[in-house]
Amino acid sequence: MTEPVRWRLSTRSMILVGGGWWLVVESHRMKIIVAITGATGAIYGVRILQRLREAGVETHLVISRWGARTLLHETPFSREQVEALATETYAPADMGAAISSGSFRTDGMVIAPCSAKTLAGVAHGFGENLVHRAADVILKERRKLVLVVREAPLSDIHLENMLKLSRMGAVVLPPMPAFYNHPRTVDDVVDHTVARVLDQFGLEVSGAERWSGEMGVGQEVD
């Protein structure tokens, strides 16, 4: 079966032909960078890759050194299995990769999970590895950057770094569970956050449980 391909349409220009204006539209396959770093919650990155593959989105994957260690510790997946979910993969030390340049067009980047170290590196422009550099490119090009920050409790440093990035236009999206959808399994909890992440890119996840506005049906609430 042929896999679906997600295309994004973007208006480029108007041209005058035979006395009338014609709208010229350029389409491109959606491209999203996915980074998995060393915080707990590697399954979030894996599930995002799975959902993006199902949606036909082209993905560019970077797994940090500690991200790879955490992946093996927390999930049943090998690094090779996770990399097989992506369209392209890069080593974290490959500073010459396509995603290190702003001229390589993408629709954005998600770091899931995002460690406190990665958060600090992106906030302060360290650029010491490809995850930092790719995120720096996304920020300077004014593209969508989503950070699934996994840390608790949060220190002043963490909060200030998140505020700094939010002011730059990044979306800080910690993996907060929702209970209005009555999750039954860990997968349900993970899927809720993944759906919220993909919402940021205008992508709909099949079967996502969303708030309907109904509460306490058949019950009196003070």
Model-based region annotation:
Residues 3-5, 9, 17:
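Short amphipathic, helix-prone segments within low-complexity/disordered or flexible regions
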Residues 7, 21-24:
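Short polybasic linear motifs
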Residues 10-13, 27:
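Serine residues within intrinsically disordered or low-complexity segments
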Residues 13-19, 105:
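Intrinsically disordered, low-complexity serine/threonine-rich segments
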Residues 26-146, 152-222:
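A cross-family phosphate/adenosyl-ligand binding-site feature
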